[in-house]
Amino acid sequence: MQIELSELDEGIMEIRPRENLTAANAAEFKILVQESLQKPDSLRSYLFNFTDLDFLDSSGISSIVYLHRQINKLNKSLAIVYESDQIEEVFVLTKLNKLLNLFQDYEEALEELSD
């Protein structure tokens, strides 16, 4: 799985998978993010950039929920930015739109994490 990790100036770790998050790669995504959680305390927030994704399956959703809990345990913030209407539908159907900080605009997500 191709994933870009970028540490932004504001203490934000941006994690951007370049392919859909499915059973084929959700475990790899989860492991990579868990490894980034071991980084120094200079990181205070995480941004999952899903703008290249068109689809999430149940394994992808499970990974997101697990990582959300892990990030919360560390008293850090998580925002998710996406563009796909299909992904929005998944978040709404699973009611994750009530649990997660979701954005369809990259700048809004960054602003939320920078506050």
PLM regions: where:
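Short acidic-hydrophobic, aromatic-tinged amphipathic segments that line or gate anion-handling sites
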Residues: N101-D105
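STAS-typified acidic loop motif
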Residues: I3-I31, F50
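Acidic phosphotransfer microenvironment of two-component signaling modules
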Residues: D85, E107-E108
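Amphipathic alpha-helical interaction surfaces in cytosolic regulatory modules
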Residues: A23-L99
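Residues at or immediately preceding the N-termini of alpha-helices
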Residues: A26, Y106-E107
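A short, charged, amphipathic alpha-helix used as a generic interaction element across diverse proteins
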Residues: S114-D115
